[in-house]
């Protein structure tokens, strides 16, 4: 008799995606981050659901409802901190996943890559709106500053901002709609993940050599299920260590002060995972220019398949490109540091140089370097 997993309509889909899926035999630990992102999304949805049971999206009670979760709800503190630090883990995995895609040329699967960029935007939007919900000082002022950027759009900007706010300032209407969007977006993200995987399984996974591996495939289960399980163990160990030993390490102390529209914090800054984009935004003196640079800092990923000039797919055998890639990583770390610093000398000029280098590397230096490497191949 044929196994039920190969005949049942639903089980068949699971079987083709997770069990009998042909996978390259040589994919490294860098390919673990896809499944880790799935785990992070699952953790965020489950913890978020339990938080939503006790949270109230009203300006008068939002802050105290979060305090109530931490103090009075059974294990509320661990649910809240798993959710807050789970977001940090999510972004660590996201950045490493995108970095892997750039290094190994996975962006040549353009459909999968473009859905991935959409996912990145969706997760960033969700995280931003989630940060507003506790209604602390940084929540309120972060929401005010970032939504206000849309006023830079010519002609419709001011109307657009007031439409998003639901009034003339960030208030109850804004908080309520942000909670609604923050609740629904993870499910939209989950649907996009399915599309992401659908496109990936059309082509099959890339591998560290960048060479087509159809001749040498192994079943996903048990080889990569056990490998993913090990990744889960590492991620959960790191997350639980963070939650149980230093839950506020990545947070902002200002967010433990209830939102006050009459008192601006000395340094308004987003969560650490947005600091690189925030630094790029601040590095341009013009408001509209800054907003465009902010959007382009992520949207630039969409042009990577078009800028691929190398005859080889991945960077494994391209040492000059490797050097530029690691300069890009160092540049992003520099931008992250600058984003958390006050707007004063020498941080302003460092931020401007790092922002310029970021775009220069992706748009000019890396494609030019690939052409040079093509020439070197002929020697």
UniProtKB/Swiss-Prot annotation:
The keyword Transmembrane helix applies. Heme b b566 binds at residues 97, 196. It is found in: Mitochondrion inner membrane. SUPFAM superfamilies: a domain/subunit of cytochrome bc1 complex (Ubiquinol-cytochrome c reductase), Transmembrane di-heme cytochromes. Binds 2 heme b groups non-covalently. One of its GO terms (molecular function) is ubiquinol-cytochrome-c reductase activity. InterPro entries: Cyt_b/b6_C, Cyt_b/b6_C_sf, Cyt_b/b6_N, Cytb/b6-like_sf, Cytochrome_b, Cytochrome_b_C_euk/bac, Cytochrome_b_N_euk/bac, Di-haem_cyt_TM. The keyword ATP-binding does not apply. Keywords: Electron transport, Heme, Iron, Membrane, Metal-binding, Mitochondrion, Mitochondrion inner membrane, Respiratory chain, Transmembrane, Transmembrane helix, Transport, Ubiquinone. It comes from the Eukaryota. A ubiquinone binds at residue 201. Heme b b562 binds at residues 83, 182. CDD domains: cytochrome_b_C, Cytochrome_b_N. Signal peptide: none annotated. The chain crosses the membrane at residues 33-53, 77-98, 113-133, 178-198, 226-246, 288-308, 320-340, 347-367. GO terms for biological process: mitochondrial electron transport, ubiquinol to cytochrome c. Disulfide bonds: none annotated. The cytochrome bc1 complex contains 11 subunits: 3 respiratory subunits (MT-CYB, CYC1 and UQCRFS1), 2 core proteins (UQCRC1 and UQCRC2) and 6 low-molecular weight proteins (UQCRH/QCR6, UQCRB/QCR7, UQCRQ/QCR8, UQCR10/QCR9, UQCR11/QCR10 and a cleavage product of UQCRFS1). This cytochrome bc1 complex then forms a dimer. Belongs to the cytochrome b family. Heme 1 (or BL or b562) is low-potential and absorbs at about 562 nm, and heme 2 (or BH or b566) is high-potential and absorbs at about 566 nm. This is Cytochrome b. It comes from Ochotona huangensis (Tsing-ling pika).
